A protein has these predicted regions:
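A structural signal for short hydrophobic/aromatic patches embedded in well-ordered alpha helices
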Residues: 18-21, 32, 121, 150
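Auxiliary Fe-S-binding modules of radical SAM enzymes
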Residues: 1-30
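Conserved Radical SAM active-site core
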Residues: 14, 74-164
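N-terminal pre-triad scaffold of radical SAM enzymes
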Residues: 33-73, 81-105, 156
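Glycine- and other small-residue-rich loops at beta-strand/loop junctions that grip anionic moieties
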Residues: 21, 53-54, 139
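Alpha-helix N-cap/helix-start motif
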Residues: 29, 61, 114-118
Length: 164
C-alpha cells in the first residue's frame, strides 16, 4: 500500500459540481464510477474504514421498496420503533471510540422528518460528538434548514437513504 497517497487532502466539490454529478446521464455512469474509484485510490489508498451502524428508527417507512424490511408494507418480522433507546445509541458510540473505529453511522427509516424530530436527533448528535466521534446519518429527505441544524450539532456526513 502506498501510504503517501493517504496523506493527501481530497478536493471538495461545489454545490453546482455535486448537482452536475447527480444529473449524469445513464450512459456516462460507468465512466463516472471509474473516475470516482481512481480518485478514491489516489486520496485514500487501498484502505478499509470500519463503521458501526445503529438503527435509530426502525420500520414504518412510507416508501414501498419491495426488498426493504423497513417499508410499512413489509411483512418482515422486525422491531419497529420511532427512536432507539438512547442508552443503546450511546453504547454504540462508546464502542466506536473504545475500538478506534472510523465512524458511527445512524440509520433512520422514513422519508421525511419534522423539525422537532430533527432537533431531537441533533440533541443526541451533540452528546455523541462530545467524545469526538465522527458521525454520519443515513436519512431521508431534509430541508436545507434541517441539514444545517444537523451540521451545527456536529454531524459530519449525510447519506440519502431513499431508493425507488
Amino acid at each position: 500500500m502506498n501510504t503517501a497517497s493517504c496523506e493527501k487532502e481530497a478536493p471538495s466539490l461545489s454545490r453546482d459540481e455535486a448537482i452536475a454529478i447527480l444529473d449524469t446521464p445513464d450512459e456516462e455512469l460507468e465512466a463516472l464510477i471509474d473516475r470516482a474509484s481512481s480518485l478514491r485510490y489516489k486520496y485514500k489508498g487501498n484502505r478499509v474504514s470500519i463503521h458501526i451502524l445503529t438503527n435509530a428508527r426502525s420500520g414504518n417507512c412510507s416508501q414501498d421498496c419491495a426488498y426493504c424490511a423497513q417499508s410499512c408494507r413489509s411483512t418482515a418480522d422486525i422491531d419497529k420503533y420511532k427512536w432507539v433507546d438512547e442508552d443503546k445509541l450511546y453504547q454504540d458510540n462508546d464502542f466506536v471510540n473504545d475500538y478506534h473505529l472510523s465512524r458511527h453511522c445512524i440509520g433512520l427509516s422514513g422519508m421525511k422528518f419534522t423539525d422537532k424530530e430533527i432537533e431531537e436527533l441533533a440533541r443526541r448528535i451533540r452528546k455523541m460528538k462530545e467524545q469526538g466521534t465522527h458521525l454520519c446519518c443515513s436519512i431521508g429527505f431534509l430541508t436545507e434548514h434541517q441539514a444545517k441544524v444537523l451540521k451545527e450539532a456536529g454531524l459530519d456526513r449525510i447519506n440519502h437513504n431513499l431508493n425507488s
